A protein has these predicted regions:
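Hydrophobic alpha-helical transmembrane segments of membrane proteins
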Residues: 2-9, 13, 17-19, 27-155, ...
Length: 571
């Protein structure tokens, strides 16, 4: 008889519970299989004689996880209520401010002409186009972020438990439609009350319908996810709907059949939308158990990355989260990259490949080109302020969409450092692809502005002189440093932020605000002069020099640090 101690038993004497291993002794190398005799598992010291309880329900597991998180959070119920109150108040105040601004803008807009001018677009048609674009953007975002996912700790523990997965995933499945419904209601109410001057029961029905349609869109994405449809296909479907919005606007302008008013939704339509949303919600709930763990982990990871980027005001990380969520794992067509003849051309070719493979950024370029065109063909928006805002937003969208290669290089600079190129030269080469993209955008956007203000060739010439500013601003924003978290923090509804975060976020847009002054003045005066074009060329040169700088800090800050170092050295 050979005695076997329990694991962790430090006593040298034999345990009374023994196992008959046969006549042969057991050496240090372990017994041979033939020497082991039959034994009862109840006598095995590694398997205790314990009573097995019932498997807990999914709801109890969720509650246990929540209690454990609260126990280690270090926050009281009062602080939680304070945070919720602050967040809700901030959201309500923000919506009211936006609603007030849009209402003032709607009152300041000139009335529509009594007879619709050929080639124009009515304000109700513009609202319909914007809502269609919002539906496409929502579907694309839902596809990229899941929409149902499990965060890292939940995916590691919950998904492996022998319980009904439906009960574990119900809160995550309900979170997306609820957030989309709130956002959809806010957008529809702002557009209806601000631009179309709707009020009363009509506004209430429109807000409810907007909330239900937004929830239906997210639920459709969840149904597709439960049926094994790849997230990339859902995102591509949303991108196609988003591209269809400017196409519909162009078709309305060319045909001249633009509606003068949108039909007011009835209570029957609202009830029908609610029934559809309820049926889709029941279908999603019934299929939650069929969701594969891989898609849940990918969706949860992308959503966590996106939320962290929004809270930290990092647009680059947000773009990576949205792009990586629907990136293709392989490509059917492989380019031979014949344009890569050296380090410089290889860098430019890589940026072109990144832009070509990102459908989201190609769609962003198309939408950016349509904004100034829409602003010039809508009679109520064809004003100085409307055209200026459309050019500003559209130009920044086009430049930012084409600088994805620079943003990836900022995250992983090892490839750039392997090239025999100076850091300044690398940043200037990164401006080539944004410059080409903005050049194409300029021909369309500034051509439309030229038709609106007169002398299209002069406006296109001014826009070509401003192309380097857009490219330099996009590259400067891509290479901006991360906020310094060792500085004093400022409490905000979204959490604590360092004091210099706004200064970091402003890197890139600051060049657009300053170095495009001739373009802004020309739009304000509705004319282009030789002095404006000359000044724009000079400021474009300055923008390229600033955008290619490798210093993370500004000139004034560097001078102050040098003075401090001199004082310390003199002391």
């Amino acid at each position: 008889m050979t005695s076997v101690r329990e694991p962790g038993d430090a006593r040298g004497d034999a345990d009374p519970r023994t196992v008959d291993l046969g006549a042969a002794d057991v050496d240090d190398d372990g017994p041979a299989p033939a020497d082991l005799g039959p034994h009862d598992l109840d006598d095995d010291p590694r398997v205790g004689d314990f009573e097995l309880g019932e498997v807990p329900s999914a709801r109890s597991i969720r509650r246990f996880t929540a209690r454990a998180a609260r126990a280690r959070a270090g926050a009281s119920v009062g602080s939680l209520l304070t945070d919720v109150y602050t967040a809700v108040t901030s959201v309500v105040i923000s919506v009211l401010i936006v609603l007030g601004v849009v209402q003032q803008l709607g009152e300041a807009l000139p009335p529509a002409p009594p007879v619709h001018a050929p080639g124009g677009l009515s304000l109700p048609a513009l609202v319909a186009v914007l809502l269609l674009a919002a539906v496409g953007a929502l579907l694309s975002t839902a596809g990229r972020l899941g929409p149902v996912g499990a965060e890292g700790p939940q995916a590691a523990w919950w998904l492996a438990l022998p319980v009904d997965r439906r009960g574990l995933l119900r809160p995550a499945a309900a979170r997306g439609p609820v957030v989309a419904a709130l956002a959809g209601a806010a957008v529809v109410v702002v557009l209806e009350a601000g631009l179309l001057a709707s009020s009363g029961a009509t506004l209430v029905r429109a807000g409810l319908l907007g909330a239900l349609v937004a929830a239906v869109v997210v639920l459709l994405a969840a149904v597709a996810q439960s049926r094994g449809v790849p997230r990339r296909r859902t995102a591509v479907a949303g991108d196609l709907v988003l591209v269809a919005a400017p196409v519909v606007a162009v078709a309305l302008v060319l045909t001249g059949r633009t509606p003068t008013a949108l039909p007011a939704p009835s209570w029957g339509v609202v009830v029908a939308a609610a029934v559809v949303a309820g049926l889709l919600a029941a279908l999603v709930d019934a299929r939650l158990g069929a969701l594969p763990g891989r898609t849940l982990r990918e969706g949860g990871s992308a959503a966590t990355q996106a939320v962290g980027a929004v809270v930290s005001l990092d647009s680059r990380e947000l773009g990576r989260a949205l792009t990586g969520g629907a990136a293709a794992s392989s490509h059917r067509r492989v380019s031979r990259l014949r344009t890569a003849r050296g380090p410089a051309t290889a860098l430019v070719t890589a940026d072109l490949v990144v832009l070509r493979r990102s459908l989201r950024h190609v769609v962003q370029l198309v939408v950016a080109a349509g904004l100034p065109v829409l602003a010039t063909v809508v009679p109520q928006l064809a004003s100085t302020v409307g055209v200026l805002l459309a050019v500003l937003v559209g130009g920044w969208m086009a430049a930012s969409a084409s600088a994805e290669g620079a943003r990836w290089a900022e995250m992983a600079p090892v490839v750039d450092r392997l090239l025999p190129l100076e850091a300044r030269t690398v940043r200037r080469l990164r401006m080539v692809v944004p410059g080409v993209a903005v050049l194409l955008w300029t021909v369309v956007a500034l051509g439309a502005v030229g038709i609106w203000a007169g002398a299209p060739l002069d406006w296109v010439l001014l826009g070509l002189a401003a192309v380097p500013v857009w490219a330099a601003a996009a590259v400067r924003a891509a290479y901006r440093p991360a906020p310094s978290w060792d500085k004093p923090l400022v409490a905000t509804p979204a959490g604590a932020l360092p004091t210099g975060v706004l200064q970091v976020v402003a890197r890139g847009p600051d060049l657009i605000a300053f170095c495009l002054l001739p373009l802004w003045i020309a739009i304000g005066l509705h004319t282009v002069t030789t002095v404006m074009v000359t000044a724009q060329v000079v400021l474009s040169t300055v923008a390229v020099l600033i955008g290619s700088s490798v210093h993370d800090k500004g000139w004034l800050e560097r001078m102050m640090e040098e003075q401090d170092e001199r004082k310390k050295a003199g002391a």
